[in-house]
């Protein structure tokens, strides 16, 4: 670390220091040459400068000799810089392979060594399935390096990013190596976490399997495996590629889904109407690419609120009709869960009249997400919407929605507008890894945000509680068979694990519906309990959420349950459920409060 910092300092300031020293010594040499000699008169400053510039290094004395030395060193600087870069990478190679302990490994970029043509692996539509995540990997490494050691393997890193990474303490490897070689070079045998995010999902699967091989002998290693694009992630089954004993240590992720999950947690669309029995959610969604589709799907799963009304979504994109048809092809049940209105427009074509029409809809806008890949386009629409909001009558009782714009990796315009723009706090910028400007506004560690989104702690506690309750019922009813999903977390299909994750994600929605919030337990004088009518309301919301999650996963109603054919008898309105089944929903709500208590948290009335 010290050697790396020294190399970075010399590389960054070496030339400046050499030039300053050279100019200083040159001045001393000129001054020395102007002094009168015993057998000659004093010379002018210009004559002394000329003599200094044309002096012979072999005959130089005093300051002139020092000047020639510094001049030669400065000329050699280009070669020294090349050497320093080589030495720096060699030191990083040594440090990662032999010295790193309990570190995070991030492997990203495109691998020529492991391309399908070189390995014999063949992927259909290979070019279309490659998604560059280099920028995200660099920003993630910079963010995570503030709290833990990080080793980044990325083949191509420009000079400015390389300097940033070194200054942050990130160990950087740029060689393109075979799977086993890159894991050995990054010290995977002693690492605590591997984040495999190469451009092709096949490489990430191979890296994760190699990391769990017996030769690595690291039973504590956790792996986060990127599966892109979204079309592949939708049908991906973890159990098709990994053995059951490996599943607990693997979490697949997709950047668009992580963004959707986090953006709806940080800026929930129901916030202005959460406690209303009448008002419904109206989301304006600009961009129906991978992020927009993930947000829409997340809303369909979690958008079950106190009012019982379907969320309304106004979707704006230049090719929105075709994109919406493709979504319905993958999820035909969406039409029964969200009310979608499509507006086929380019962002540049949106006018103030369009914005006013959405704002003054019979169901007023409660939130706007702007999530195209073009930050300039995002900025235009965000400012247009903010300006129309500010132009409204301040005495109006209409909802004041928030505007959230997605900031792509490497972006800076939206961050600047968020911090310095005139938006009266109704504009927010979102990124998985905030920019420097955003970090000035928050004390949270950005790198941990992404990792925490892949943490299954609460979901596993939900499942363990479900299994414990089912075991008790089996003991009380001799001959009763355990429920189909009453088995260890490691043996659950990914869809069942996702169902538990959704249960955890929906809890804050439920708390807002009864005007509660989650706070540290020590900040609460007396513990609160849910009133019977509150518990019943939240149980209904939980059932609606579960119902939506099941039908989006392909389940249909049938009087007899069949897991293989995805039949379930409880896919009916809450009022039609039997009392024991309703109690399961109530228990789910109460279990979340127990989980919060275990984490040192409690529910309290919203201030």
Segments from the language model and where they lie:
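Cytosolic regulatory regions of ion transport systems
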Residues: 2-24, 30-69, 73-481, 485-540
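In a subset of proteins, long, contiguous C-terminal domains/tails are tracked
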Residues: 80-86, 567-607
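Short leucine-rich amphipathic alpha-helices used at interfaces
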Residues: 473-475, 480, 517-519, 524, ...
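A structural signal for well-ordered alpha-helices, especially hydrophobic packing surfaces
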Residues: 508-511, 550, 593-596
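Amphipathic protein-protein interaction modules
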Residues: 526-579, 584
């Amino acid at each position: 670390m010290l050697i790396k910092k020294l190399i970075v300092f010399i590389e960054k300031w070496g030339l400046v220091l050499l030039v300053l020293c050279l100019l200083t010594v040159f001045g001393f040499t000129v001054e020395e040459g102007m002094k009168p000699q015993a057998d000659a008169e004093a010379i002018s400053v210009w004559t002394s400068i000329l003599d200094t510039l044309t002096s012979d290094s072999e005959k130089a004395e005093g300051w002139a000799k020092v000047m020639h030395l510094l001049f030669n060193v400065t000329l050699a600087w280009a070669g020294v810089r090349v050497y320093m870069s080589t030495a720096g990478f060699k030191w990083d190679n040594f440090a990662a392979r032999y010295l790193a302990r309990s570190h995070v490994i991030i492997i990203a970029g495109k691998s020529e060594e492991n391309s399908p043509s070189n390995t014999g692996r063949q992927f259909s539509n290979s070019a279309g399935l490659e998604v560059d995540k280099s920028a995200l990997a660099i920003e993630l490494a910079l963010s995570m390096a503030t709290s833990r050691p990080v080793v980044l393997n990325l083949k191509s890193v420009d000079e400015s990013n390389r300097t940033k990474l070194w200054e942050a303490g990130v160990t950087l490897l740029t060689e393109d190596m075979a799977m086993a070689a890159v894991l050995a070079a990054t010290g995977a045998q002693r690492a605590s976490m591997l984040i495999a995010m190469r451009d092709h999902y096949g490489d990430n699967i191979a890296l994760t399997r190699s990391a769990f091989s017996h030769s690595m002998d690291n039973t504590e290693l956790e792996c986060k495996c990127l599966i892109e694009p979204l079309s592949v992630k939708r049908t991906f089954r973890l159990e098709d590629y990994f053995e059951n004993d490996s599943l607990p240590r693997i979490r697949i992720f997709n950047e668009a889904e992580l963004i959707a999950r986090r953006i709806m947690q940080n800026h929930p669309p129901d916030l202005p109407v959460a406690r209303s029995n009448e008002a419904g959610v109206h989301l304006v969604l600009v961009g129906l690419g991978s992020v927009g589709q993930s947000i829409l799907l997340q809303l369909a799963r979690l958008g079950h609120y106190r009012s019982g009304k379907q969320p309304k979504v106004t979707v704006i994109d230049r090719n929105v009709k075709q994109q919406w048809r493709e979504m319905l092809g993958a999820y035909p049940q969406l039409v029964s869960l969200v009310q979608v209105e499509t507006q086929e427009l380019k962002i540049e074509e949106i006018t103030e009249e369009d914005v006013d029409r959405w704002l003054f809809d019979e169901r007023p806008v409660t939130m706007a997400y702007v999530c195209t890949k073009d930050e300039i386009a995002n900025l235009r629409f965000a400012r247009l919407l903010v300006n129309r909001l500010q132009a409204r009558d301040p005495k109006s009782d209409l909802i004041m929605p928030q505007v959230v714009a997605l900031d792509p990796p490497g972006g800076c315009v939206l961050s600047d507008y968020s911090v310095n723009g005139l938006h009266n706090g109704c504009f927010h910028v979102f990124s998985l890894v905030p920019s420097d400007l955003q970090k000035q506004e928050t004390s949270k560690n950005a790198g941990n945000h992404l990792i925490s989104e892949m943490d299954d702690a609460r979901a596993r506690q939900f499942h363990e509680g479900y299994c414990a309750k089912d075991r008790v019922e089996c003991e009380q009813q001799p001959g009763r068979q355990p429920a189909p999903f009453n088995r260890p977390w490691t043996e659950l299909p990914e869809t069942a694990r996702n169902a538990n994750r959704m249960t955890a994600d929906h809890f804050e929605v439920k708390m807002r519906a009864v005007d509660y919030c989650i706070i540290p337990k020590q900040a609460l004088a007396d513990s609160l309990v849910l009133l019977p009518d509150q518990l019943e309301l939240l149980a209904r919301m939980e059932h609606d959420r579960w119902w939506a999650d099941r039908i989006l996963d392909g389940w249909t109603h049938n009087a007899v349950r069949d897991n293989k054919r995805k039949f379930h008898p409880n896919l009916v309105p809450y009022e039609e459920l039997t009392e024991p089944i309703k109690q399961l929903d109530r228990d789910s709500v109460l279990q979340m409060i127990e989980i919060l208590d275990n984490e040192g948290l409690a529910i309290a009335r919203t201030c």
